């Protein structure tokens, strides 16, 4: 149930799609780590890319497969979906680019990032691209310090309202933030409102780890990746402390 609400909530977010289309042009086939419901996967396939998506969440994989089954343009011919762990996958194939959109990379511990990079570079061709987007590390650090030092959680902030895909009841989406020992926990609260006044809440939580641009780049270098671009948004602006995102583009050169 929660997965369907998450998919509906994020389906309208498309600001990053031109970026992924542009940077993967000529870098087929693409491997997407954490493909989820296919928010990025399907548009890339529609743009003519050959793409493989990995995800551990079975419900998300099933949703994506159902979307492909209903598609009238034979997108399934350009998309392979695998239910597996992005840290330990074994694929007998080489890719021109590997991407990890949707801020997923910042949810990994340092040990997990090491495993992912070591595994990923085994299937990335020489001069292939690895692209990861994360929330601005300066913002994560400042927010963590504020919440941690004051021992507080943020108040839920109403983000949007949409119609439940199955019941047609309104769903209020709120978010709240809390400091953990090594990061920020981001809770999404999905409140389904019933006509009789009842409310049913679903919770989706993600934790973003404290890290820095410098550490990310050091990890890239150790994995045989040269950082070729450091961007602050999906329109290509340079990264600085006020950027909404940190987007790292690495080129395999070892």
Language-model region placement:
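SAM-dependent methyltransferase
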Residues: 132-214
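Class I SAM-dependent methyltransferase SAM/SAH-binding core
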Residues: 45-88
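Class I SAM-dependent methyltransferase "Motif I" SAM/SAH-binding loop
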Residues: 34-36
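C-terminal lobe and adjacent flexible extensions of AdoMet/dcAdoMet transferase-like proteins
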Residues: 207-254
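Conserved class I S-adenosyl-L-methionine
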Residues: 1-28
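A short acidic, Gly/Pro-enriched loop at the edge of an enzyme's catalytic core
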Residues: 87-97
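A short glycine-rich, Lys/Arg-flanked "PGG" loop and its adjoining helix->strand segment in the class I
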Residues: 114-126
């Amino acid at each position: 149930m929660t997965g369907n609400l998450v998919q509906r909530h994020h389906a309208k977010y498309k600001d990053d799609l031109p970026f992924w289309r542009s940077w993967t042009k000529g870098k087929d086939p693409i491997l997407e780590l954490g493909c989820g419901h296919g928010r990025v996967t399907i548009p890339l396939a529609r743009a003519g890319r050959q793409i493989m998506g990995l995800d551990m969440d079975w419900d998300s994989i099933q949703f994506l497969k159902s979307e492909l089954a209903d598609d009238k343009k034979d997108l399934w011919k350009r998309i392979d979906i695998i239910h597996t762990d992005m840290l330990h996958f074994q694929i007998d194939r080489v890719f021109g680019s590997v991407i990890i959109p949707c801020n997923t990379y910042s949810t990994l511990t340092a040990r997990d990032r090491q495993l992912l990079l070591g595994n990923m570079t085994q299937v990335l061709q020489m001069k292939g691209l690895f692209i990861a987007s994360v929330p601005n590390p300066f913002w994560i650090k400042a927010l963590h310090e504020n919440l941690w030092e004051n021992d507080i959680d943020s108040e839920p902030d109403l983000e949007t309202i949409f119609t439940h895909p199955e019941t047609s009841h309104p769903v209020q989406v709120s978010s709240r933030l809390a400091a953990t020992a090594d990061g920020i926990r981001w809770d999404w609260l999905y409140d389904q409102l019933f006509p009789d006044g009842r409310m049913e809440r679903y919770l989706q939580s993600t934790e973003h780890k404290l890290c820095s641009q410098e550490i990310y780049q050091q990890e890239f270098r150790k994995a045989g990746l040269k950082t070729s671009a450091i961007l602050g948004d999906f329109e290509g602006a340079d990264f600085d402390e006020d950027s909404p995102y940190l987007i790292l583009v690495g080129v395999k050169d070892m």
